[in-house]
Every structure is written in structure tokens, then in C-alpha cells.
């Protein structure tokens, strides 16, 4: 069985790993290749701060909440493992701030120690009148992609830097199954009017005194368009930019000023922080994640395609649950082709 995964961000690499872990012992040979024109450190995943937090509003598809829950549980089970440092995985506590009271999020029982802020805590944030505190997880994308790459390499998965122009091109080369994890660029392979770029710009600063994440929310501005501060192992990520439909990869001075001024107002000690770097990336925004099978007619036969893209700004938050689901879809293909008996479920 020849499988090609297109895309080398967190969605592509985690999906490749799930498929190989589940089926390599019952399907031999299982030949998996990863094609991408961008690898770490140039992927969208590399730009992300990596804080586990779904959108505040409940998704229309309740399964997305399940996938996020599965991802949190998976990461929490590894947070004290010897590999946690290599994964870029650690626990972190922090604040979500609002101008007025809102309902608790659907994931309040998933994170640890969720509670409302006390009046004394709110005194630290004079621009906000309501908030939450809880402990979550950070999974730093750059570390995690390197770890996934190493695990896949150990398993014999091959990586090729190339720009795929069409599914037909890959099918003609002999792929039995194509896994489409191309993120915001999925529309180049198959038209998808629901998919749009959600441009973000972030700054990395040296501020080792920052120990808690601080996310602010402004309904009038919309998601990701108000300041946020997320500490990592080496640097602190500052952000607050979300521009739907903007394809510019250039760092913008106006956005730079918006981020810097907003975050320094939120946490005045950041005025003393040294700016390390600045990055721009595109969140693959879609009303719902596209995670489904499709049969494409390629010449005399059909080629199976598994689509797994459209994860917006929460790819690291939901990736493992989606990878498990994609692996299940792969298993159904094998069942229909009668190529393998299904292994016992341990996902």
C-alpha cells in the first residue's frame, strides 16, 4: 500500500504517524511518503505559540470538541514523560479576560482548575471586568514538528520537498491513498470556497519574567484581534492580529505597532522586553474542519483521498483527535479493499 501525505505541518505529520502506528503491523508493505514545499521551520505550525485552547463558542460540529478533548488527554498523558522537553510540551496557567461576563466554555472541565477570577485578580487588569483562570498545556510547534519528523524517519517514512500541482499528478505516480493536509493552500489542489486565510502576525520577545498566558477577548473586534501574551520555553509570543482573506506574508509595521502597544498596555513590564523576531502566518479558516474521504477518478481507476484541513487557529489544539479520525478513515479503505484485518482498537 502506497500512501502519500501532502503537507508537513502538525496535521500532516501527526496523521502520517497515526496511520503508520496503527497499520504497519497488519499491512505490509506500508509505504508512506510526505510531500511538502515547506518543512519546519517554515510552516504555519512553526508560527503558532502552541497554547491548547479551542474557540470559546461551541463548534457547529460537536465532533470537533471531541477531537480537541482527545488531543488534550493525549498531551496530558505525555506531559511528565521523559520526551516532554523534546516535544516542547509543558503545563502553563493563565488568564482569559473579558469586558463583561460570558458563559463558561464547553471545555472548562477539560482543562485543569478552571475558575472565575476574583475581584483582586481583576484589579491587575483595569481594562477588563471579568475573566477565568485555569491550567492548560503548551505544545511548541517547532519542537513538536522535529520530534514527529524523527519518529516518522525511524519508521521508514520518506520526506520529499516538492510542490504538488494536483492529486492526479500523485495518483499517476502510483499512490493508492492520498492524505490531503495542505492547510490554507488546499484550495490550490481542489477548489474550496469555504476556505480562507486568516492572516496573523506575532512577535517573539525575551521576557523570562512572564510565567502566565494572558488572552483578551473583544466581541467587537472578533477572535484573535485583541492582545494576547503566551510564554514559551525560550521566548514569549505577543499577538493580536487576525485578517480574513489577507494573503500578505510581509510583516506589517501597523500590525507591529498594534501588537506592541496592546500587549504593553496589558502587561506594562513588556516595555523592557527585547524583541527577538517577528513572523507572519496564515490560519486555514473554514466554518468546519474538512475531514472526510473522497474517491477521485484518475485514469482507469479511482484514487482514495482523505482530506484533513481547515483547522483555523487551533491546529495544535485539535491535531491528535483529527489524526486518529483520519487513521480510522484509512482503516475503512483497507476494509473495503480487503487488504487487512482491522487491528484491535487502541487509539
UniProtKB/Swiss-Prot annotation:
One Gene Ontology CC term in the entry: cytosol
Main localisation: other
Binding site for FAD: 8-11, 37-38, 43-45, 49-51, 163-164, 182, 283, 312-313, 315-317
Domain of life per record: Eukaryota
Temperature dependence: Optimum temperature is 45 degrees Celsius.
Reported effect, residue 38 to H: Found in a patient with ALS; impairs FAD binding; 20-fold decreased affinity for D-serine; 300-fold decreased affinity for D-alanine; 3-fold decreased affinity for D-proline
Required cofactor(s): FAD
Assembly and interaction partners: Homodimer. Interacts with DAOA; the interaction is direct, can occur in the presence or absence of FAD or substrate bound to DAO, and results in a complex containing two DAO homodimers and 2 DAOA monomers. Interacts with BSN (via coiled region); the interaction is direct and inhibits DAO enzyme activity.
Protein name: D-amino-acid oxidase
Species per Swiss-Prot/TrEMBL record: Homo sapiens (Human)
